[in-house]
Amino acid sequence: DQTKLRVLANAARSAGKQHRETTLAELIFSAAKQRGRQHIDLREPKRVHIVGVGGPGMSAVATVLVEMGHQVSGSDIRRSELITRLENLGITINIGHNPEVVLGCDFVTGSPAIAESNIEYRKARDLSIRVLSRAETLASICRCATSVGVAGTHGKTTTSSMLTTILLGAGKNPSYLIGGDVISLNRGASWSNGELFVVEADESD
């Protein structure tokens, strides 16, 4: 993907020659601040709609949001096992895209794969409803707990699953949002209201 390559190249050039004591974490935080992302306070109940809710990433976000106590709805173009699982959690799912589903929402979010021209996004903006990216929504969730982000090019899901399992075994009762189901738990996302939140952070976040 040439566009992504250009973005990465520009980011690498902007980093320049860093002082030897500058850490990778400091560079990441610096880059994040420059992106000007928006957040929303999720400590109080919100009404949220998720566009493209049927994928593993957004279905995990939906699961965490509804378990936090928010009123969640979603849309996708086809039914799936994940859609059924979300409906069993009490999430209202619309198959197909309908601009009217965003009425009354506090904010709308969605998969990075969904075009900005999507009719539900357009309707939300017409109504001055905030539209947050998945990364912005995830960052807003992270503000509600002490968050442990697992990043990297390989092994994020495995490492996140191991960390979650270890913390559960230690009685820490963590919340978690992982890119795949933890085999021992048969799910990849949960909100426990505990102190810790384990989150798998991919390149889109």
Language-model features, listed with the residues they occupy:
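Nucleotide-activated sugar donor-binding and catalytic core shared by glycosyltransferases
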Residues: 1-36, 157
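Residue-level detector of family-conserved "landmark" positions at structurally sensitive sites
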Residues: 8-9, 22, 75, 96, ...
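N-terminal leader/targeting and accessory segments in enzymes
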Residues: 36-137, 196
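Phosphate-binding loop of NTP-binding sites
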Residues: 64, 87, 101, 112-205
